[in-house]
Design a protein with these regions (language model features):
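Terminal amphipathic alpha-helical/low-complexity segments used for targeting or macromolecular assembly
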Residues: 1-53
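Structural signal for interior beta-strand "rungs" in well-ordered beta-sheet cores
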Residues: 50, 54-131
Length: 131
């Protein structure tokens, strides 16, 4: 994880200050290996997750250029894979199915817009550019 990913995320917002604090610390926790700093980032990240009702693991694979509109009540399974330039809005669930023909987690392509209160569950693939 490099500084470039955080910069790409910043570019998706009109002003850098518009990026949700949750997202900033999500990327910082992913990219920092210096223990004292990583510990501080993890504490802040965990606090923001609780306040915003967001369940995204620091190990979740999300490409650069992430845009979170209204960062609240979002759940993404740690095994899901999200591409570059994804838009995610409040109430989104990206989850796992544990049985049946769609057992597994979603793979979401690049430049996908995921609207309010959308649930994507199971082993499905959402193609590039889907809205």
């Amino acid at each position: 994880m490099t500084k470039n990913i955080l910069e790409q995320d910043y570019m998706r917002y009109p002003k850098a200050s518009d990026m949700p604090a949750f997202q900033k610390y999500f990327r910082k926790v992913q990219s920092t290996s210096f223990f004292p700093l990583q510990f501080i980032y993890k504490v802040i990240f965990r606090l923001l997750k609780e306040i915003r009702h967001i369940e995204i693991s620091r190990t979740t694979k999300i490409g650069e250029g992430l845009y979170i509109g209204h960062a609240y009540n979002i759940t993404i399974n740690p095994n899901a894979i999200l591409g570059k330039n994804i838009n995610i809005h409040r109430g989104v669930l990206i989850g796992q199915t544990n049985r049946g023909g769609r057992q597994g987690t979603p793979v979401i392509g690049n430049e996908v817009w995921i609207g309010i209160n959308v649930a994507i569950v199971g082993k499905v693939t959402i193609g590039d550019g889907t809205q």
